[in-house]
Amino acid sequence: MRLWPVLLLSAAAVPAAAQSASPPKLIVAISVDQLSSDVFDDYRPVLNGGFARLGRGTVFPHAYQGHAASETCPGHSTILTGAYPSRNGIIANTWYDLGQTRADKAVYCAEDERVAGSTSSAYTVSPWHLKVPTLGDYLKLQWPTSRTVAVAGKDRAAVMMSGQRPDQRWYWNGKTFATDLANAVVPQSVISARTAVAAQVAQPQAGLESPALCSAKAAVVPVGGGGAPVGAGRFVRAAGDATLFRASPEFDGATLALAAGLVREMKLGKSAAPDLLTVGLSATDYVGHRYGTEGQEMCLQMLSLDRDLGDFLAFLDREVGDYTVVLTADHGGKDIPERESAAGVAGAARVDPALSAGTMGKALGAKLGLAGTLLYGGNFGDIYVGRGLAPAQKAKVLAAALAAYRAHPQVEAVFTNDQLARTAIPVGTPDRWSLIQRARTSFDASRSGDFVVLLKKDITPIADTKGGYVSTHGSAWDYDRRVPIIFWRPGYPALTVDMPVQTVDILPTVAAMIGLAIPRGGIDGKCLSPAPGAVCVTE
């Protein structure tokens, strides 16, 4: 069942608009979580809804999230800041601050750990850790009456795309749409969305009808690590199951419906100053995590998302008229190793549990005769050496950890904090960057670990799948880094540009479309002149 209010279902498309010489009054920035270039390429020829329409804009099908830590928070932090994580401070979804006083040393990217009693899992949502302005922040500096509205399926997506001063920010908190803005007056559209979603979740969901394109992919695949088989699901859901609601096409429909309601209620795009709407569509990521990218489940998700995007654009045609859309993704993703192995991917495997920081730390403690937590982190990415050690002991632990990780057959590279600090921010196109250059753009000396571990290509860093996640992202490899970028505005010609541009290029490009001043030296991206209406100034 599609979750679209009557007001959206009645929104018919208007005739194609002529090319406008004036800047648009509404910028719509959409992130489709985990929409890799690979998935985009696979489905683009068969999609005839929203993606087909946006595809008649300027399409960069193989753009990049240049950094190594290809996770949701870092990815969203680049889209509307124009800055790498090394500049904006969002190096991962979670990092560690071993000097903080609370017992939980982990730090969630979109929390304010200064709040008493908070933890990295029971946190106060905040943009506290984002070090740079977003597009919405820049808009308010130049046009104080400009409004920024954010809607997303994840709090970190909403926060990182809307920045410090949004007028409305709403995200799914696991139960309903919530906000972190103090003393916020809840719009009627949010009240309606909450009621509609609660009623939707309370009803069971029968399996979706599967067209031939998707049913051809419906092969059951056993999953290692204790998880349930995947591949032939059709999003059957019991009444009240909000977890499966989130990992289904229903979720993006609800997010877009709320976004449309706020556009109408707030009359976005109808004032003198340009407005910004950011939309974080998270279902593709949850579907990829639970089922992988090559089964019937992802096929049904992509077809549904295409249809819902088409409805949303038709609504904007009627409600706003002249607007511009930029669509991209926070990161890519890959399929489950079991299905990849069957397809002939020789190196596809699940990570060795011995690589987790906790397990490795215990092994090193036994070897070195040291007690306590020696290592903090996951089974890849930033690893931190415990602080409760004498300098000589810490040096021994670091040396032993580096040797152990580097010797492991699933590890491609290990770079120390010192190595990364000495490495220059890369120039040139991101498809040519070395691994250490990719890691450098994810490095912040005040937040990064003592060293970073990069796994070999096609290693899936999930060993235990009993919790429901069977696949993930986060690597420095191109299947996780490559994403599409689409710029669209009514009346401009279609253009596909197969160049390795980056998501950090979006901010300066949009700024060039609307005449927005961006301080020199404050960003890492560059203006993309093929984008519709972008007047790029070369210095």
What is the predicted function of each stretch?
Residues 24-36, 53-54, 79, 139, ...:
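Beta-strand elements within well-structured catalytic alpha/beta cores of enzymes
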Residues 60-80, 150-160, 280-282, 324, ...:
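Short, solvent-exposed turn/loop segments enriched in Gly/Ser/Thr/Pro and often Arg
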Residues 84, 90-273, 282-289, 407-409, ...:
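His/Asp/Glu-rich, glycine-adjacent segments
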